[in-house]
Every structure is written in C-alpha cells, then in structure tokens.
C-alpha cells in the first residue's frame, strides 16, 4: 500500500513539472515573439526617421506665416531615387506621422514588407496601386500603407472618424518625383469592400475638369480580409514648382 502511495505521489509530482515546463515554454515563446515584434517596429521607425533626415530639405519660413499655412519642405528626389528608382513621390499630412516616400512596384505585394531601401521591414512602404499612374492623373488614385499599432505609416488614419481631427488635418500633400505637387482635401473616411468600386482600377480620365480622387487605404483595426479602412480625398490645388518656393 505504501509503495502504491509513493508511486502515485511521484506521478503527480512528474505531472506538475511537465505542466510547469510547458507553461515556461509558452511564456518564453510569447516573450520571444513580443521582443521580435518590438524590434521590428523599432527598426522600421529608425528607417523612416533616417529618410526624413536624409531627404527632406529644410525650408526657412517667414516669421509671419500662420501655422495653418505651413507646407512641407522640398524633397531631394535625386538622392532618393539613386537608392530606389521605384520612388515616385512623397506623401505628407501636416501634424501627423504621415511623412513618407511613395513607391510604385510591379504589383501590390512588392512593397508590403520592403522599405524604399529594398530591405525587409515589418512596416513595408507606402505604395501606389500598380494600376495607377505615377502622375496621379487618374480619376482615382489609391495609395496603400500598413495599419501599424505604433501609429506609423497609415496607423492613425482611423482618427479621421473624429470631426475635430479632420478639422485639424484637412489636407494631404503629394510631392512628385518628376516635379510639382498636389494638394488634396480630405472628404471623409470609412470601410470599403476589397472587391468594391473603390478598387475598380484603372480609372483614367481625359476630362480636365473632372475631380481627381485620392484614396488612402489600410487594414481595419480588426484585420478583416474583406474590407479596408479608407480616407477619400479630392484634388484641390496643383503646383508646378517645389513647395518651398
């Protein structure tokens, strides 16, 4: 009887250790995954902070210039395109994290997880739908970016759901690598089906007076496969000179 009791105790002890080891393994794996994700985010942030330092040309402003009239500095596209000829522009939204080069790949997967430096990054790049023209002259131009949890890329577009945020950040600027710039006014935001009208491209137009629309597209916060979160904008102003002139 005593022997059976010892065997039973030993089995329970072994089972406990197995459970402890399994829980420890799960914890260590979870810790590894968390650290890997955090490192990826930190690395991506550094990539685009370096891009701002390297390719944005600071512009001295008139002291009397109103904050609401501020416009983005010029971009050294010659140096930027020496790194990657797929760079076709730069997107900027005053007072937000959106301040990135725009890429145009052979398809819509090429720059999902590749930076403008052609290196892997969890944040990927901001990129134009491959069916759209690099001159942004289509009836609708779609630009994609990841919905990053740290707010990078298009990670804060959902804030346009709030009226006060829209009022504070009403314009999207596109600086073109071939010269000139475009200023878009934000119309609104919402969800769009991936097989819906928004992504029915290309939509070229020969009507010079027709509205040119810009759609910024990212994943929804719940990562649904059938819809995307979009911010729709309309072209309001076009410039042929650098924005610092």
Task: Give the ranges of each region predicted by the language model.
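Alpha-helical transmembrane segments
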Residues: 11-28
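N-terminal Lys/Arg-rich, disordered targeting/topogenic segments
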Residues: 1-13
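Solvent-exposed, non-transmembrane regions of membrane-associated and secreted proteins
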Residues: 27-245
